[in-house]
A protein has these predicted regions:
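Inter-lobe coupling/hinge segments of SF2-like helicase ATPases
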Residues: 275-284, 288-295, 301-738, 754, ...
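Surface-exposed amphipathic alpha-helical segments in non-transmembrane regions
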Residues: 702-704, 710, 745-750, 784, ...
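Short beta-strand micro-motifs in enzyme catalytic cores
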Residues: 5-7, 197, 723-725, 773-775
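Short beta-strand elements
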Residues: 182, 596, 752-764, 805-813
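C-terminal structured "cap/appendage" subdomains that terminate the fold
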Residues: 747-784, 790-794
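Short secondary-structure junctions
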Residues: 15, 590-593, 748-757, 801-806
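Accessory, non-ATPase domains that flank or precede helicase/AAA+ motor cores in DNA-metabolism machines
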Residues: 1-442, 454-470, 780, 788-792, ...
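A short, contiguous, amphipathic alpha-helix enriched in charged residues
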Residues: 35-36, 736-749
Length: 817
């Protein structure tokens, strides 16, 4: 049989149940240019609708009339390296997503096309005969008439509008099969490449000077020629700006072939470092010892993984800088991940000071154009150091030598939307591909990571002391039950009040932490007990004092707060303090004292995290009040007091990680204190002062916490002694959701019951969100291909089975909630 060239293509329109590499013929004109990593337009499904695809591999196959040909090539060069193609396929298998879901995570939004489907009248179509052929079918006639009414070329969106609530797909499919219509695809890039135009003389210097003498009546043209005679080549816009000449004068000179215009790529960038890179500060003896061990791993010919435990303020970042310097010297690239966008400006400023323009930044807060151009700089090898949040793990770095995850225990490294990946898992895969060093750093490592270090899966390094022998903050535990007995029902304990007063007297700054924005979590009637709840979600509305609004932080629903209870007219009471209420309490306790609030609402008004942080440092605002975004990575030398206002908030929830999250949160926020020359203090407010986790966090004793927590997890069989796999079902009808969940539970018990503990159906903590009920089946199991295969099979079955058409089903590794 005749062998022909074919391409294995991942198709955008393929759902998870039907996702696989599809085989397409490669037309003769594309055989020399098409390569893996290029996007193409292909006909897909019964209607041969034009659809975007990604070429995963090239092959030879027997000629088959059923094979469809590729319509056209979209990228002249591959936009994906072979390593990133392998990563996308691995993510498809690992995270229960389509290959294109993985590609959308790997590539920046600016690289994608907006593809529209256009239906065209067949060449030399006899309209009357075609309408007769449609017979009595109103839908076929409507589709054909709509295309003809638009000049024989009509976008699918226009046809859908003409059909109203009806679907035109069946009618269009019939018209295409009868060869009355053809289908085309039109694509438009989301972000275009930016080019700068440069002007230079297109003639000799002598000829240009002769033209200057001839053109005394065209002063703008003369000015342009004189400037180019002097400087040779410059930006066309700058030449016009400097000379005051209009662009028409430049165009005239170009048309007369006196001036030549050429273009160069221009990178839109979030930051530009203009100074000379400075030397990296020397390491202390303790840091040098850690660096020496990590440097040996960096130079290893095999992939390596290490955990660096360092108390807050121990100088982990300085170790990172020296390791990156070594990687660059060896011709390798480095990626540093940080958990919050708010930390990125500080890291960029610090790293750019040492590595200059070799640093690129990637995070979701950048404009599409800047993120796309930073991606291009990395891909072109112009940036060899990448700093960013979770998505920066996909940076197209060639010859990756070092990948660092700072504060590796943070939940923000886990994606909660498809694909539901953890950056740490992706980092492990990429480091294995590049034979690179994966370095996890934290003052409160993930319990699983610490266990892996203890059992030899990771190398383990420690920095147990603060930089320059600075002391850890002294911590006081404030018993809020005793405060109530003493008549203090406010949010600020007497102990914290005294410490704040002392800090104000000294002219030092303080940070107050509460992980709840808004003014009050619950608004209820003192007479009848009625509460304000979200009509779309099973949660109460949070009161925001600034605009007198009640807001749902899940779906965004909002309404005005009433003066009195809308049910009985009784007095409204406000419970569950948020950052806005704390700010009001501080102003009442310390009249005239300036405060700065750092939460999502304040940032929305200020514009950026960076603006608020710079203002806090520059103006030395006495008190900052903030949510979780202030707990890590921030370094203000004048902050000597931290107050944790509700240490119990994350402790008593139904999650095996509650102790770990509470310990980490308290330890991290307490670590913001005393990072300068003055000693730091911290006050932890709690209703359970005897709780062991809170006491361990107050002592900053991670080892003691780890020992007690790992013993508890071994007893309960939770990670690292098992893997957690969850299958979640959501839908508008609760009965349908529970029925599907029960079916999934029974399926797992029959297929993998011996390998896994199967629990559920159980509602999620917020059971109804955006008018969709959410239930889950959870498996505690050893990591096995059989369990994962069973999960993939049941997800595919439920999403295609007609009896479950009213629900959506997805699987998730180690879910956060």
């Amino acid at each position: 049989m005749l062998q022909i060239p074919v391409a294995k293509v991942a198709v955008l329109a393929a759902t998870f149940a039907f996702d696989r590499p599809y085989t397409y013929k490669i037309p003769q004109p594309l055989t020399d240019t098409l390569r893996p990593g290029c996007r193409v337009m292909v006909p897909f499904s019964r209607g041969n609708r034009p659809c975007e695809g990604m070429v995963l591999a090239l092959d030879q196959a027997q000629d088959d009339p059923k094979l469809k040909p590729i319509m056209r090539q979209l990228d002249p060069e591959p936009i994906l390296s072979p390593e990133l193609i392998r990563l996308a396929i691995w993510m498809h298998d690992r995270f229960f997503c389509t290959i294109y879901d993985a590609l959308h995570a790997i590539l920046p939004a600016g690289v994608w096309y907006r593809v529209s489907t256009v239906y065209c009248a067949a060449p030399e179509l006899d309209a009357d005969a075609a309408l007769t052929l449609c017979g009595r079918s109103k839908q076929r006639r409507l589709a054909l008439e709509t295309v003809l009414a638009h000049g024989g070329r009509c976008p699918l969106e226009t046809l859908q509008t003409a059909f109203g609530d009806n679907d035109p797909a069946s009618a269009l499919h019939w018209l295409v099969e009868q060869k009355l219509l053809t289908v085309e695809g039109a694509e438009k890039r989301v972000v275009r490449d930016k080019q700068l135009e440069y002007a230079s003389l297109a003639v000799s210097l002598e000829e240009a000077q002769e033209e200057i003498r001839r053109r005394r009546r065209a002063p703008h043209q003369v000015a342009i020629l004189e400037l180019l005679c002097t400087i040779g080549r410059a930006s066309a816009d700058e030449v016009c700006q400097f000379t005051g000449a209009p662009k028409t004068s430049m165009k005239t000179l170009v048309r007369q072939k006196l001036v030549h215009i050429d273009t160069e790529p221009y990178f839109r960038r979030p930051t530009h470092y203009t100074g000379q890179p400075k030397p990296i500060p020397a390491l202390t003896a303790a840091q040098a010892e850690v660096f020496s061990g990590l440097q040996a791993l960096l130079r290893s010919p095999d992939a390596q993984a290490a955990l660096l435990f360092g108390v807050t303020g121990s100088g982990k970042t300085l170790v990172y800088l020296h390791l990156i310097e070594q990687a660059l010297a060896a011709g390798q690239g480095a990626i540093l991940l940080v958990p919050e966008i708010s930390l990125t400006p500080q890291m960029i400023e610090a790293f750019s000071a040492y590595f200059g323009d070799a640093v690129a930044v990637l995070h979701s807060g950048l404009p599409l154009s800047e993120r796309y151009d930073e991606w291009k700089r990395i891909r072109a090898g112009l940036a060899r150091v990448v700093v960013g949040t979770r998505s920066a793990v996909f940076a197209p770095m060639e010859n990756l030598g070092l990948l660092i995850i700072d504060e590796e225990q943070e939940d923000t490294y886990k994606s909660e939307s498809t694909p539901r990946y953890h950056a740490r898992d992706v980092a492990k895969f990429r480091c294995a591909q590049h034979r690179a060093l994966l370095l996890l750093g934290s003052a409160t490592p993930d319990v699983v990571s610490r266990y892996y270090a203890e059992t030899g899966r990771y190398h383990y390094f420690t920095l147990p002391d603060r930089f320059n022998a600075r002391k850890l903050p002294g911590v006081i535990i404030a018993d809020m039950k005793q405060e109530l007995r003493n008549g203090n029902s406010g949010s600020i304990s007497s102990v914290l009040y005294a410490e704040l007063e002392e800090n104000l007297r000294r002219g030092e700054q303080s940070i107050l932490f509460l992980n709840r924005r808004g003014a009050s979590k619950l608004v209820t009637c003192a007479e009848c007990g009625a509460t304000y709840s979200c009509p779309n979600c099973s949660v109460s509305l949070t009161y925001h004092q600034g605009n007198q609004m009640l807001v749902c932080h899940h779906c965004g629903y909002r309404q005005r707060v009433d003066d009195r209870c809308p049910v009985c007219g009784g007095e409204l009471r406000f419970f569950g303090d948020g950052t806005e209420r704390i700010e009001a309490d501080v102003h009442a306790l310390f009249p005239g004292v300036e405060t700065l609030r750092m939460d999502a609402d304040a940032i929305a008004m200020a514009g950026t995290h960076e603006a608020l942080l710079q203002r806090f440092a520059r103006e030395r605002i006495p008190i900052m009040i903030g949510t979780q975004m202030i707990t890590k990575g921030l370094n203000f030398e004048n902050v000597t007091l931290v107050g944790v206002l509700n240490a119990d908030q994350s402790l008593y929830v139904g999650d095996y990680r509650a102790n770990e999250r509470t310990f980490s949160l308290i330890t991290q926020v307490v670590g913001r204190s005393g990072r300068g020359d003055a000693p730091g203090r911290a006050v932890i407010q709690t209703f359970t002062p005897a709780n062991e986790t809170i006491r361990q966090a107050a002592r900053q004793d991670y080892d003691a916490f780890y020992r007690s927590e790992i013993a508890l997890r071994q007893l309960n069989g939770t990670p690292p002694f098992s893997e957690v796999l969850a299958v979640t079902v959501s839908g508008a009808q609760e009965n349908a959701v529970v029925r599907c969940c029960a079916y999934i539970r029974d399926y797992f018990r029959q297929t993998v019951g011996e390998r896994a503990e199967v629990l559920g159906p159980a509602p999620l903590p917020v059971v109804r969100m955006n008018n969709r009920y959410r239930y889950r089946v959870t498996l505690y199991c050893s990591q096995s291909k059989a369990v994962r295969r069973a999960a993939a099979n049941i997800v595919m079955y439920c999403n295609t089975e007609k009896s479950f058409r009213d629900v959506t089903v997805f699987a998730d590794d180690n879910p956060l909630d």
